[in-house]
Amino acid sequence: LLDCGLEPGGFTVRYEGYLQSIEIVIASNAGADAENFACIKEAAGYEIVTFQDGEMSAAYMDYASELARPEMMVMYENRLKETGLWNGFPSREDFGSLREFAEALEAHAGIEPASALRVSGDGILFDPPGDSSDFVDFVERYSNLLAVVAYATTKDRLNFGFIGNEKIAD
């Protein structure tokens, strides 16, 4: 990281048990900017990089996501081909609204439209009905939908999120 031009004392590198990974935290006084991203990524490898500055953190996440995007596209495409969901895949530009596109994604995955996805702002949210406490049933029902949404959101650079994580805390 020093070879990347970061200032000594401007970053920390330590193992974080709650992450089960090494986390590199880059402070504002490290002197990092977007020009350093390639070097930082190479130096960090697969470790977690966090910037204390929110804008820098978001910019770095965008940078890292773009690097991973081609590999992710291939992985998702292969998954869709394996499950028979590649042919006839809905195209975003064929729909007037994000809501209509989300409903088409559900239908393509064999899920009733408007039953598990909803739109909020410029993003699609996974919000399935809470009618199944059986994990195996849940996975069987929604794994194809999540594969379809993962491909669509990566391809079209759409925001995607989950609703209902508060149940994990119970």
Placement of each model-derived feature along the sequence:
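Long, low-hydrophobicity, acidic/polar, solvent-exposed interaction domains
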Residues: 1-170
